[in-house]
């Protein structure tokens, strides 16, 4: 699962501009840190960084466009759009809402890990830090058709209180929180939501309290619900979530065949956001806008 190599830094941002008449990102709902509708490729002007190209196509869940990621064959790296990051106000709780569509005949890795998709990092690492070996990385992704929420903290192996997300296993560690049932099995848009809250700490006893929260929803239905989670130790009393990373990734040899995915109507906030209002739909098909 958490075997992704430390993500390389993508130099200077060079985005192709789309004409001014394209709709800008949707205004963030109340309480949101930021929102992105992917209606045009000018993400850099909306706070995104560490990305080189963005392919915006039609057939969106809402608005004029959505972002497309493509693997052209079983051996290829992700193409069309690059990974990208967005900082937000530091917070001890974070929520995400986005719409995900997988191409017809989508294939899984055949393992209990990958693909990776969306990630959160914290103030304990830099704005350029890779997700695979951090003080805490959270994952929201579909694995084997289930919704997986996960966490790793491999960089804490040498910290005074050590790892909180399980022991090292072949160079990685992680705790997984999966839906009980397979949820992704078609080529339709689905609303993916997750909410994480850092556990509190007991400084007098020098230990974490088991009150962290991990929750996930698919199309408005609660499918993951854990309220006894430890995400940090007393080594990190000032830890906050502050960075979102969008980085679809299949490890070498894990991609079954050529396929695509699309993401739309992303919102990051401090509380659960919820699905789009009923009736807010696509603006129709269009060609790519890179």
Task: Name the predicted role of every residue range.
Residues 26-49, 279-280, 287-288:
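Extracellular carbohydrate-recognition regions
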Residues 32, 91-93, 99, 177-203:
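Trp-centered recognition loops
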Residues 42-70:
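Extracellular glycan-recognition surfaces and repeat-rich motifs
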Residues 69-97, 131-133, 162-179:
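Secreted extracellular polysaccharide-interacting domains
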Residues 120-169, 174-178:
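Glycan-recognition/cleft segments
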Residues 191-230:
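Carbohydrate-binding surfaces in secreted/extracellular proteins
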Residues 208-210, 253-265, 274, 278:
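Extracellular carbohydrate recognition
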Residues 226-262:
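Flexible glycan-contacting loops in extracellular carbohydrate-active proteins
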